[in-house]
């Protein structure tokens, strides 16, 4: 597979990721308790729609269709965001979970755009690099805005009393079981040494 083919695959992944976010951001905006977060997510929705349009221009420049690939990574990150929205938390603690999910989303996109820009630069695709850099700059700015807005929210959350432990839901039990399986697969020898 040539580098251009890899780039096209990566771009299709980003196109899918951005389209998934167009659907997810209104839910984050609606779910957030903090007015500043609501506003940030709503504003970023409009930016994301613009990013989708820029990606369409990239594909036009390449003479390729943008569709045909689903971004499983973004689907997983969005699923974590849905989990944050379903938490039985209140106020700043609830919003802290949403902030974490939003930052994971932004950094996933940042990594994707940086990879695409590197490939397009290597291939000498200046117009495409310019379009992708516009998207990257917006993602970097969005991550910074979320981090800045999140600072006071997290401080407020840290000051809140810890809630009493509740029984785990079925989803949380399943997640804990999968986490344990991941640990065993990733580092069985280390776990064996710790157990002995």
Regions found by a protein language model. Name each.
Residues 1-196:
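Amphipathic alpha-helical hairpins
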């Amino acid at each position: 597979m040539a580098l251009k083919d890899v780039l096209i695959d990566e771009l299709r992944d980003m196109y899918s990721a951005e389209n998934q976010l167009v659907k997810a951001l209104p839910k984050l905006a609606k779910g957030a308790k903090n007015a500043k977060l609501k506003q940030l997510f709503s504003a970023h929705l409009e930016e994301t729609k613009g990013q989708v349009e820029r990606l369409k221009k990239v594909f036009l420049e390449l003479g390729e269709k943008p569709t045909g690939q689903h971004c499983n990574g973004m689907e997983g990150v969005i699923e974590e965001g849905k989990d944050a929205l379903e938490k039985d938390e209140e106020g700043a603690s609830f919003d802290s979970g949403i902030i974490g999910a939003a930052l994971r989303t932004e950094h996933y996109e940042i990594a994707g755009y940086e990879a695409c820009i590197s490939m397009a630069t290597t291939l000498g695709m200046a117009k495409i690099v310019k379009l992708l850099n516009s998207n990257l700059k917006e993602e970097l700015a969005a991550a910074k805005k979320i981090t800045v807005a999140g600072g006071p929210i997290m401080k407020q959350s840290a000051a809140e009393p810890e809630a009493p432990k509740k029984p785990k839901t079925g989803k949380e039990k399943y997640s804990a079981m999968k986490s344990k399986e991941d640990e065993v697969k990733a580092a069985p020898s280390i776990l064996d040494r710790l157990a002995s």
